[in-house]
């Protein structure tokens, strides 16, 4: 199948797109990949939807902004893809399927017998109508309904990508996005995954709150700051770090309040140290040392995060590009791959990745009208 995958992360930065040819097991070809920055208007609507989601009590009606935001996400995806296809000389009829993750505005893990909640906004029916192609979407809700965490979902793709590169276990793939998650590939058919803690999401929120930009570009603030070890310890006291794996996070699960007394540079340096220590503790939780750690996601562009990871982790730290991977496109590739698995009825979540009782299929496919 030729599939176009889409991903929009919690950083609200861009629509990522990638083309794969896959049967949901192996990858026969990697097509073009790219991104289109979200418009300011779309970002504002999605921020409003996220704020509404954070206030949304269980049992209450869905916030009205969700429907408007879902249409906006679909329209933004279509506009991004139209430009992407034109750039690469492609047409919609070349694709068997589209895979749209949607925009996460809420993710609550199951706790103390209370089931989780997860919301990804995106009007898949509208996208199918605009493109004339079937769209796989809603990848997480079946896992959550079955008692799973609903995240992370990329691990099965991490294995396929590693095999396509000739990599062998034991291997770790670390995605440093808004939240950081790791996939441990121990051996044939043996893999586990979970969210280690915040990635660069808290740094983004901090920089935005201080009116200092959208993110710490190139680690320029963290590079001249000093780590406040007491604040790192306070952040690490969060009960999440005592919970057994598999487990998942939302980027808003941690408060910036402990960082308020710190100067911007010191706060950024402290969050870098916190992210690296949280990842390190995640590796200790697994109790095994991989041959190497392959880092994907936007966090790998921050030299301070990469230096902190190299100092903290027990194995060599490499970037996705060191193995010829497209590090900014891994998530979009993953949802192209998961869309193919959805179409073929193959599982996308597993007991050791989301805590679900058995391997679960996921996603729904909507046909164009």
From Swiss-Prot:
Catalyses which reaction(s): 1,6-anhydro-N-acetyl-beta-muramate + ATP + H2O = N-acetyl-D-muramate 6-phosphate + ADP + H(+)
Gene Ontology BP annotations: 1,6-anhydro-N-acetyl-beta-muramic acid catabolic process; amino sugar metabolic process; peptidoglycan turnover
GO molecular function annotation: ATP binding; kinase activity; phosphotransferase activity, alcohol group as acceptor
EC number: 2.7.1.170
Keyword list, A-Z: ATP-binding, Carbohydrate metabolism, Kinase, Nucleotide-binding, Transferase
Top-level taxon: Bacteria
Reported function: Catalyzes the specific phosphorylation of 1,6-anhydro-N-acetylmuramic acid (anhMurNAc) with the simultaneous cleavage of the 1,6-anhydro ring, generating MurNAc-6-P. Is required for the utilization of anhMurNAc either imported from the medium or derived from its own cell wall murein, and thus plays a role in cell wall recycling.
Protein name listed in UniProt: Anhydro-N-acetylmuramic acid kinase
